[in-house]
UniProtKB/Swiss-Prot annotation:
Protein name (database record): Chaperone protein HscA homolog
NCBIfam families: HscA, PRK05183.1
Signal peptide extent: none
Alphabetically ordered keywords of this record: ATP-binding, Chaperone, Nucleotide-binding
Known function: Chaperone involved in the maturation of iron-sulfur cluster-containing proteins. Has a low intrinsic ATPase activity which is markedly stimulated by HscB.
Organism: Tolumonas auensis (strain DSM 9187 / NBRC 110442 / TA 4)
Amino acid sequence: MALLHIAEPGLSAAPHQQKWAVGIDLGTTNSLVAVVRSGVAETLKDEQGRDILPSVVRYLPDGLQIGAEAKHAAAEDPLNTIQSVKRFMGKALSDITQTNLPYQFTGADKGLVHINTCQGEVNPVQVSAEILKALQLRATEALGAELDGVVITVPAYFNDAQRQATKDAARLAGMHVLRLLNEPTAAAVAYGLDSGQEGVIAVYDLGGGTFDISILRLHQGVFEVMATGGDSALGGDDFDHLLADWIAEQADLIAPFTPRVQRQLLDLACDVKQQLSSQDTVAVSFAQWSGSIDRTQFEDLITPLVKKTLMSCRRAIKDAGVEADEVLEVVMVGGSTRVPLVRQLVGDFFGRTPLTSIDPDKVVAVGAAIQADILVGNKPESEMLLLDVIPLSLGLETMGGLVEKIIPRNTTIPAARAQDFTTFKDGQTAMMIHVLQGERELVSDCRSLARFVLKGIPPLAAGAAHIRVTFQVDADGLLSVSAMEKSTGVQAAIEVKPSYGLQEEDMLRMLRESVEFAEKDIKARMLVEQKVEADRVLESLRQALSKDGDALLSPEERSVINDAIQNLVNIQQGDDTDAIKAAITALDEATSEFAARRMDSSIRQALQGHKIDEVN
């Protein structure tokens, strides 16, 4: 059966009409824009011949400066010059933990961070939009045409709020977002690893502000994401801060510093760091102090941070179920991978020389451009297979009638994704897998595709069993869903055609409704999640009371807990999410002493009949 023809709204039906779509690497420190011309992906330069646009925006009383011009003015005007804004995307004021930033932060009504400037308060979405506008202008001037769409890359560890903030920034800049693409995936595309030797590939991405590690398996031209890890607040900026602190210590400067001095220190540290990638020793001068630092001293400063990235690599490899020596290729991404120590330790960890032939600053933008060119429809008919995408998200039902999306809409096929789930009740030996299609948050608003049951789950405590559910869509659009209990290997599977019976008008209606009811759906999901959590707490507590309540509680204590239980049961019937959450907290507080006594009792029983030396 032929795949349902899917086209993005507004795209021309003409099969060979050239359309311009660009890939944008919206980075913490630097940003780039790239395009595919005549089949070759290239980054676009500004009038001065520079590929890289520093991700810096300076607010002036009568205008803006963006990029290198703004970066150069940062030391003189740190309060109005916003750098590394990507770190603040989707964050609340309470999430900002760095104390050495020169900005004046405030919290908005909804808790989102704002920054005070001479033009008033601005938020990270607005700042990012200015960077995107500059890249869009560069692209339209270089191409002599308007853009039909963009693919913007984000760290794999970005959460929903951070991803939505990125989309909001693009829309504020007047862009049509074809897709957000994980940076490691873009790098793999840039290196053409999809047509290389089958096996395991690691993508090590250390940028200015984020670190991501992705373990991929290539099989028959399909990348399966086996595991991901990383740190959304670790990158080359942290190298700069450590080096800046070292310089300040050598110069006998006492913190806290003025914003201007802080910016001067960071600029100097960044310059010294870059020089140490190619030199053994660099002369350093600041204030009244002059001295030098060698590469070994710098490496001593940053070794703990680099080793921290390797801990993430180790966890990702373990999660993927492979060994480091099984990795065929290691792709290095991000400007911070130019640091010799990073390349050395990563190479030692994986036991092979990392791939560095493509400029690590450009590789993500290049991969995004290749993906954008595919999505906008510029490939010849012989390659149209690459254009087939999943029209609506695929997922499964979780407790409370919620939908957990496994493969998002617009994912290019073939594709594979896996996610772990667990049991809800003690002794649960079977699990119903309900496969769904759609963009809404509730099962009742999505399209049911199939159901099957996984039996033979070991009767363990709630949450102890681990079931891996894998979704795979082949080149013909056939979806296979399998579920496997990890400890026993017992599994079940089903195949279904997601596009069967789906008319284009149905798909468009479902997409429109997902936008129209987005806010309502999120509120409904939050309510259901709290009700499910209440059920979980009540189920667990009732079992504990049945087993140990009479022995460990006085009648008065039991009465207090029963009142708290009844309060939660009553409030759970309503529609006030915050009230349910508060009732759960109140019940937790009412049972805290009971929980402590149960723990003490369990420890005494475990130690009963044992000697002290046996315990040691």
